[in-house]
A protein has these predicted regions:
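An alpha-helical interface "stripe"
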Residues: 1-212
Length: 212
């Protein structure tokens, strides 16, 4: 990617080059233009894939109401610090309401969401969400579109804003601050973001999610 650093006169070309660079370094799947609902379903699918034991989910995927139990727990978290503890807590508890799962129906089940010991191994999944769609807290503002998110096991933990060559990196920082001000990262799956990255072909800044 560095060889082409002077050639990124268009932001999209920079985004594509960064995507290929990530794919060459362990990230293994690209999701294009996902909505929040699609990312929640993607997370649900990964949780199911990582919890197929008979005493967990077996052969029965999470129902919409079971995934809502997970999201309700996410939405109860009020700070990035607490969210980090949630993610690194390795598992989440739900009460099975899928009647087809006669083994676990009506029981509390603990589901693995992330294991720090499985970084780059085990059941870890590394995905790139390109140009995710955001809903603002105020419907009058309309929807927004980010540049890139990095997902670990379906959880969007890194948000990246890009600017082309000869645009100051502060403009990407401003874009992130604007999204924060508009409440995009306040609730739902996007509230799981831990790190913001502002990036041009010439410069990169990153900082922890400071919360509201």
């Amino acid at each position: 990617m560095a060889d082409n650093i002077q050639g990124f006169i268009k932001e999209l070309a920079f985004e594509e080059a960064l995507t290929h660079h990530l794919l060459d370094h362990g990230w293994n799947e690209v999701i294009k233009n996902p909505t929040e609902e699609q990312l929640v379903q993607n997370w649900a699918d990964i949780i199911y894939g990582n919890n197929r034991e008979i005493d967990k989910l077996g052969n029965y995927p999470l129902t919409a109401s079971e995934m809502k139990q997970v999201m309700d727990q996410v939405n109860m978290i009020s700070s990035p610090y607490e969210m980090n503890r949630f993610i690194n807590g390795k598992q989440v508890c739900i009460k099975r309401d899928n009647e087809a799962d006669t083994n676990s129906f009506g029981k509390e089940v603990y589901l693995k969401i992330f294991d720090p010991m499985e970084i780059s191994s085990g059941q870890s999944r590394y995905q790139i969400a390109r140009q995710p769609k955001f809903k603002t807290a105020d419907s009058m503002l309309g929807d927004r579109r980010g540049d890139m998110m990095l997902l670990i096991n379906g959880m969007p933990v890194i948000h990246i804003e890009l600017k082309r060559s000869k645009i100051d990196v502060s403009q990407a920082c401003y874009q992130i601050k604007r999204y924060v001000h508009e409440g995009i990262f306040q609730n739902g799956i996007f509230s799981m973001v831990q790190i913001y990255v502002a990036m041009t072909p010439e410069e990169t800044l990153y900082f922890a999610n400071p919360g509201t």
